[in-house]
A protein has these predicted regions:
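Intrinsically disordered, low-complexity activation-like regions
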Residues: 2-338
Length: 338
């Protein structure tokens, strides 16, 4: 597993992750809900990328376009999910098991800060990338500290899981959680790369939709995890990017876009239970409005697919003839992108 992670742990992916949140979403190393102004800037910037940036990510996009790479990512996802499924029963009998599971991640995130400073992983970073990696550590450290509820019980859980893992899996428990931590971000970064950058770099071409099935598959696999675990693994903004492939994939059966509706509803419910009203309705991060807007777009995609069986605004790019009903829809909805 370490070998797989090291193969993926190139700093292009980390750069994608942070470039996207810093420059596109206008949220510098923060999982906060974007403001109205941020959204307006995002819609503007998504159409006006600096030529140097487009060129840079275009090369990266082409390099990443190979089946071997996709297969490795797929194996990584499967490993992460199977590991969760095996580990959870060990401490699932406790009433506050999910909180302790989160606390364990907090503990390992804290360990990661020390590992990065002394471990060989840090030594391979070029001088020009050190600030980026420090921001990576800073972002996730602050993220976990903010979103997890701490208890003093993690030591007991840690030793119990450690013994179980090393006896049954024959691998280092420390390495396992270090790997799992990066699994999450590698997967999310790939979803952003294939789902979002493809649409910007290959705008108005068939290529922009080339990886919709791939990103949809990645998101489906992550949704196999318990929704209560996803609360700890992904902030609402990150979760939104997991839902976008479900919106984008043209599925006549409506099963895929329905997953976006269902998963968003479940995530919001668990998020509200975990953080109570103080966080959910706070003025600084009004997650109530955030989930409302995400659900609105989920429903919008669902309604369009249920009505036409496809997205009419892709017809011209895909070389498809539009029906009279579709032409009417396209004419009457100039501000709706789907």
């Amino acid at each position: 597993m370490n070998r797989i992670i090291l193969n993926h742990l190139n700093f292009n992916y980390q750069e994608i992750y942070f470039y996207w949140f810093q420059h596109s979403m206008k949220e510098q190393y923060s999982p906060l809900v974007p403001s109205k102004q941020s959204k307006e800037m995002w819609f503007t910037n998504s159409k006006k990328y600096d030529s140097k940036i487009v060129s840079k990510f275009n090369v990266l996009y082409e390099i990443s376009d190979n089946r071997k790479h996709i297969t490795r990512i797929d194996k990584t996802i499967n490993f992460m999910i199977s590991t969760y499924q095996k580990l959870v029963p060990v401490f699932n009998q406790k009433k506050d098991a999910y909180y302790q599971f989160g606390n364990l991640f907090t503990y390992y995130n804290d360990r990661m800060l020390r590992i990065y400073q002394t471990n060989k992983y840090y030594d391979i970073i070029k001088e020009s990338k050190k600030d980026l990696i420090q921001n990576l550590r800073k972002y996730h450290y602050e993220n976990f500290r903010k979103f997890l509820e701490l208890t003093p019980n993690y030591e007991v859980i840690y030793h119990k899981l450690k013994d179980y893992t090393e006896i049954n899996f024959h691998i280092s428990f420390d390495d396992l959680f270090f790997d799992l931590f990066f699994c999450k971000h590698i997967i999310l970064t790939n979803i952003i790369l294939y789902d979002q950058f493809s649409r910007i770099i290959k705008r108005n071409t068939k290529e922009s939709y080339k990886y919709d099935y791939v990103t949809k598959t990645f998101s489906e696999k992550l949704m196999e995890l318990d929704i209560r675990h996803l609360i700890y693994l992904f902030t609402p903004t990150e979760f939104m990017f997991l839902m976008l492939p479900f919106q984008h994939y043209e599925d006549k059966t409506l099963d895929t876009v329905f997953l976006a509706l269902q998963n968003t509803e479940n995530y919001e419910k668990e998020f509200k239970l975990k953080h109570r009203n103080f966080v959910y309705y706070s003025k600084k991060n009004n997650y109530a409005d955030f989930f409302k807007e995400l659900s609105y777009h989920n429903r919008g995609h669902y309604d369009v697919l249920s009505r036409f069986g496809r997205y009419p605004k892709r017809n011209q790019i895909m070389g498809r003839l539009s029906t009279p009903d579709e032409n009417t829809y396209i004419r009457l909805t100039p501000n709706i992108p789907y």
